Regions:
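Multi-pass, polyprenyl lipid-linked donor-dependent membrane glycosyltransferases
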Residues: 141-159
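Membrane-interface transmembrane helices that cradle and orient dolichyl/undecaprenyl
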Residues: 155, 160-169
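Helix-to-loop transition at the C-terminal end of transmembrane segments
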Residues: 32-51
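Membrane-embedded helix bundles of polyisoprenyl
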Residues: 127-142
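Start-transfer (signal-anchor) and selected internal transmembrane alpha helices
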Residues: 1-33
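Short hydrophobic/aromatic helix or loop-helix immediately within or flanking a transmembrane segment
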Residues: 52-58, 68-96, 100
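Transmembrane-helix motifs of polytopic, lipid-linked glycan transferases
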Residues: 100-123
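Membrane-interfacial loop-to-transmembrane alpha-helix junctions, especially the N-terminal start
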Residues: 22-23, 68-72, 121-130
């Protein structure tokens, strides 16, 4: 039994996904994230600092001062950038924009996991599917699930994946 599990996890069976298929994986990951909390799109609203700080600062002071203003000692660039860009939309759509950008950021690690840059690290395609499903269905993630305030955790994961991944050819 253990040998079967080992061969499943570490065999070198890899399916190379074309660019089109990577985008399909990305879209499927976004769909799973939205389905986990459907109110992200059916009843969008700001979450925590999304409205009170990121959107409000960009609204009151403009997008550039908002981007370069540190909060608690560091720059929250992505949060402030999304807050600034959201002013190009009608006010009623700003929370939806925040939520959709957060969903896209949350889905990025799944797409990157299936890219060819992770061929040597995780050669088994099925193991990548298992990892992606674990990542997408992690329990008790309501605090960080699809909001810009906590998007930096998923961006940190992407950074690690880029650092450990192979160079593109």
């Amino acid at each position: 039994m253990l040998l079967k599990i080992k061969s499943f996890l570490f065999s070198h069976q890899n399916i190379h996904l074309k660019s089109r298929n990577l985008w399909m994986v990305f879209g499927l990951a976004c769909l799973v994230i939205i389905i986990r909390r459907i109110d992200l799109v059916t009843y969008p609203q700001f979450w925590a600092e999304d409205g009170t700080i990121w959107f409000a600062t960009a609204y009151n002071f403009g997008w550039w001062p908002a981007i370069i203003t540190p909060m608690v000692g560091y720059l929250q660039t992505i949060s402030r950038l999304v807050g600034g860009i959201s002013h190009l939309l009608p006010l009623a759509y700003a929370p939806l924009f925040f939520n959709l950008v957060a969903v896209l950021i949350r889905a990025l690690p799944v797409m990157y996991l299936f890219s060819d840059r992770w061929y040597k690290i995780l050669p088994n395609f099925w193991f990548k599917i298992v990892l992606a499903l674990i990542y997408l269905f992690l329990p008790n993630t309501a605090e960080v699930h699809a909001n810009i305030t906590n998007a930096h955790w998923f961006l940190a994961l992407i950074l690690l994946m880029v650092l450990f991944g192979e160079l593109s050819t």
